[in-house]
Amino acid sequence: MIKPEILAPAGSPQALIAAVRSGADAVYLGIKNLNARRSAENFDDEQLREAVAYCHKHNVKVHLTLNTLVSDGELEKAQEAVQLACEAGVDAIIVQDIGIAELIHRTAPDMPLHASTQMSVQTAAGLKRLKRLGFTRAVLPRELSKEEIKKLCENSPVELECFVHGALCMCVSGQCLFSAVLGSRSGNRGACAQPCRLPFSVENGTGHDLSLKDLSLIDYISEMAEMGVCSFKIEGRMKRPEYVAAAVKACRNSVDGVTDNALRDDLRSVFSRSGFTDGYYRNKLGYDMFGIRRKDDVTAASGVLKKLEKLYEKEKADTVVDFAFTALKGEPMSLAARAGAKNVFIEGEVPQLAMNKATTAEAVHNQLSKVGGTRFLCGDIDIELDDGLFIPVSELNKLRREVIEKLDGNKAQSKSFTPEYIKIQPHTSGKKRLICRFADIDSIPENWDYIEQVIVPLGDEQKVKKSLRVSVEVPRGIFSNDEKILEKLKSANEYGITEAWAGTLDGIVLIQKAGLKPNAFIGSNVFNSLSVKSLEGMGINRILLSPEITLAQAQAIGGDAPRGVFAYGRLPLMLTRNCPQKNGKSCAECKRTGKLTDRRGIEFPIDCRSGCSEILNSVPVYMADRLSEIRNMDFMLLYFTNESKEKTSLVIQDYIKGSKKPHGEFTRGLLYRGVE
């Protein structure tokens, strides 16, 4: 059995120290942008270097999260972040954006790549494709059962990581547009506002029918390790250090076979939503998994914080370090340090002449004294500093860090990095065509003359006229149904279907296995030109761009593959495996449709199919009156969900002729306002 790795969240330097001192084997953290927890404190460049040095001194690995979607305008920032990670000695990078993954693989080939759970990979076929794309590890979805995890472990060519404690989203990770559409704060961009924790009710529901209890699989760690899971992840980069310490210690006890019921009670007290759930793992889905944070939960947390601080009390810093700093005009700066019998000396850059405010001795003292997180205590600091010099804080930090590394003998091992000029090849579109997706084939109109292609649910293609231009849609929630879906795709191929659409890597691979042309659909999260290029390299035929980008961003995305935008329909806000309607009635009572109602009375339709539920937006996107503003696109997607045949005919005519006025309530989606 592989030695289990306990992977702890570090949303701040304080949480990182708590994780290390409590027994974590690895931590994951983010820099100030481009990570899925932008509201956490996170780490600046210097803090990242110090965090890596501190962790490596304690034989703890550091995984950097770059697990968000990145726009074309942010690609240079992303490359700079990869360079920083290489220089700092980060042990792996966690990625969601397939274009960023390819960029890392080219510029930093020695950097291990971990596929974020935001990539929504659910099958062995998807894991094998990740291996081909250069990934060494995948973070599995939280929605998997024990049997599904076991099957993936038996067939995976990459390491597998599972969440074992922390917050549980209602939506499958990477498939949520809820926060983005309701408030322009994208969960795919690290800015989720958690609207699902607000009151949403199904018929006869609890009033909070999108809010799940926190996950806890700590009791199953040994069992999962025997199956082949190599890393056990704790969610919580926005949580307090006390929470991190308690969760790490509880996981460590589980690995070591230690029973500590009092610590478990404290862990529940420090943060829970009416307790914990293991429903997905045990394949016991239903109302027992739902919960909210009540007043009693908050009161319990305040009562255990002081107690939990003792889990990560400060290490004994038994060595005093004295510094001597010299900065003279025209000469390289120098820093000498003495700790016990050991002396070290290093030189830096020649200081600059100050253009405005000169660096003071006090400022130098403040930076050199920052030895927290090391085994040293700061002693005397002698400073010889000429007047009128400017010394960047980063240079002082670098000198201090290198001196401490020499004293400690734990210099981080950097990885090679070769910067790349990111050139975006402009796209030139052909004629803008209509592609129509129908959830119900009975709503397909009779007149197809102006429709490029009709998309129907996989399995319904043989109910549609064979002479028509038909393609099929693979469900986004595949999970353990991969073999059944592959057989259906093969049947579609035999029937004469040539193209299929998928919103996950799993679906794309299954489509290719069945001999069909794959198209990237909703859920593929195509946000930049590098992602387009990567998908083209995988053989993708057509690409639906992310509904979270603006028209201006979409028009600027490069590449050759035909691409389009979501131009009409109710955006699918959530893909859920635990149906919210189970809070109000059993599956036997359900007619595959329902609705959620928010606190203002706004209704969101629910569509249940293929073992999952989709929560749709309350109103459709409508752009037929602004067709001239949809430029440089090869197609427009009209996404029909619960419309009648009469309504679909009317909408299609609007987009053929160019309507001057929308029918009823509508939204422009995110095509103008975009997301954070």
Q: What residues fall within each predicted segment?
A:
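Surface-exposed amphipathic alpha-helical tracts and adjacent flexible/coil segments at the periphery
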Residues: 1-22, 26-36, 49-52, 58-86, ...
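Short glycine-enriched, charge-decorated loop/helix-capping segments at active-site entrances
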Residues: 36-42
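Glycine-rich, highly charged phosphate/nucleotide-binding loops
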Residues: 43-48
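Conserved phosphate-binding/catalytic loop of the ribokinase/pfkB sugar-kinase fold
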Residues: 119-123
